[in-house]
């Protein structure tokens, strides 16, 4: 496949988009902040004057807001813990709940076999990073919680997978939310609770420890939830000789917590600048479509709705490049395998080889890796679309994922330019190729 190299990404311009989007605060799908982000993205795409831009209304997604969350050990000692509600979770009764603490391991069926989950608060270990041995269920992106819910647990606790006083919130809710109160705590507090369960040195001297003495917690979570619609923003550069065939660049604009600078204002910003650069170039043979999607943090809801909206014409999408987490991290990666809806999925080896060829041709380095959970590549792969996923910050030691500390100061402007150049040249290579595209 012949590659003709173009540039046109200005690092400061991409970074400015990141700052504008991050300044909105948390952009939960269907929230007012997300609607402001959608308006910003739409305005920037329309301002090119050379792209056809429209909004695609999604099916309902949970509209969620945290009002308050508290967690306290009440037995065998009293200890207040810092926490925050997990995205999409439900509320406890107004006075909270007091329940025994149960350790559910990694949340696998075998971890629950000897446990009495009824009237309990369950604590789980965090998912493993960059492995394929986690488990998740359809509609629940990063944990299969069906048994916990069915057996009458009163609440759920997840803790960060890295040491520090920050809270990393996992993704547990699908597009309809999570019918269970749930909070996330720090790594240290997670270990503290597990030590209490084992009656180690966490119990102060002088307090008698008995083999069957329970650990009891008080949990209070207050949230507001309702179902609402959101929007994907779609901008099209129509092809000349093969306009019905499409090449996609996809990034999600919603986020889980905090400013969401890297996750995922960084990828949205790259998409905007790549779209502007491509709009100024002659039209390619195939159509290039830029798709800014909602609801990735709720189980890829927006990209699933895009695929569903295509119906049978999804076969006209000949290649899809997904961007997520591109603004900070150790290296540039393309994903080879990940988990989606409880199954291992594979990104396109053919498209990954094109990415690799383009990246090396530009003088940059990119490496393959597996990833514990899919991003918006999942729905496209499931639909049979050759798909690649580019990211940076997937190091096991990257601490800012789904955290308040994901701010613009962690963004590497030059990294955004590199990803933008890779995307421009990959899209144009694919859109101007007359070769049969493989999977």
Where are these regions (language model features)?
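Acidic, glycine-rich active-site loops and adjacent beta-strand->loop/helix elements
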Residues: 127-129, 161-163, 223, 253-256, ...
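Soluble metallo-hydrolase cores and metallopeptidase-like ectodomains found primarily
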Residues: 82-83, 87-114, 172-260, 276, ...
């Amino acid at each position: 496949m012949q590659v003709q190299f173009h540039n046109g990404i200005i690092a400061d311009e991409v970074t400015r988009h990141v700052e504008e989007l991050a300044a909105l605060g948390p952009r939960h799908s269907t929230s007012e902040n997300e609607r402001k982000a959608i308006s910003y993205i739409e305005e920037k795409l329309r301002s090119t004057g050379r792209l056809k831009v429209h909004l695609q209304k999604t099916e309902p997604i949970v509209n969620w807001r945290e009002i308050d969350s508290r967690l306290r050990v009440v037995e065998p000692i009293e200890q207040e813990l810092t926490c925050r509600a997990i995205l999409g979770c439900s509320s406890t009764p107004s006075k909270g709940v007091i329940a025994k603490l149960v350790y559910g391991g990694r949340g696998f069926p075998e971890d629950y076999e000897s446990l009495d989950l009824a009237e309990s608060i369950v604590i789980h270990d965090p998912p493993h990073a960059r492995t394929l041995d986690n488990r998740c269920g359809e509609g629940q992106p990063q944990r299969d919680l069906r048994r916990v819910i069915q057996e009458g647990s009163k609440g759920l606790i997840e803790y960060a997978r890295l040491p520090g006083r920050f809270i990393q919130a996992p993704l547990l809710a699908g597009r309809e939310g999570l019918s269970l109160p749930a909070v996330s705590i720090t790594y240290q507090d997670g270990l503290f609770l597990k030590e209490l369960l084992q009656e180690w040195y966490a119990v102060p001297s002088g307090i008698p420890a008995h083999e069957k003495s329970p650990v009891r917690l008080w949990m209070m979570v207050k949230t507001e939830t309702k179902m609402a619609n959101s929007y994907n923003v779609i901008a099209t550069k129509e092809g000349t000789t093969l306009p019905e065939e499409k090449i996609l660049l996809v990034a999600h604009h919603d986020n889980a917590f905090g400013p969401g600078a890297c996750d995922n204002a960084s990828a949205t910003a790259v998409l905007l600048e790549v779209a502007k650069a491509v709009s100024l170039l002659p039209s390619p043979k195939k159509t290039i479509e830029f798709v800014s999607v909602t609801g990735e943090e709720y189980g890829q809801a927006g990209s699933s709705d895009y695929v569903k909206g295509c119906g049978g014409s999804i076969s006209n999408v000949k290649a899809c490049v997904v961007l997520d987490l591109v603004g900070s991290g150790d290296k540039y990666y393309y994903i080879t395998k990940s988990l989606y809806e409880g199954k291992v999925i594979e990104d396109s080896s053919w498209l990954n080889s094109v990415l690799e060829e383009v990246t090396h041709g530009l003088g940059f380095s990119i490496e393959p890796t597996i990833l514990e959970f899919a991003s918006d590549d999942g729905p496209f792969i499931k639909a049979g679309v050759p798909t690649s996923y580019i990211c940076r910050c997937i190091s096991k030691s990257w601490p800012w994922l789904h955290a308040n500390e994901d701010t613009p100061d962690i963004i590497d402007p030059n990294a955004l330019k590199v990803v933008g150049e890779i995307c421009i040249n990959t899209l144009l290579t694919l859109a101007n190729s007359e070769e049969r595209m493989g999977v």
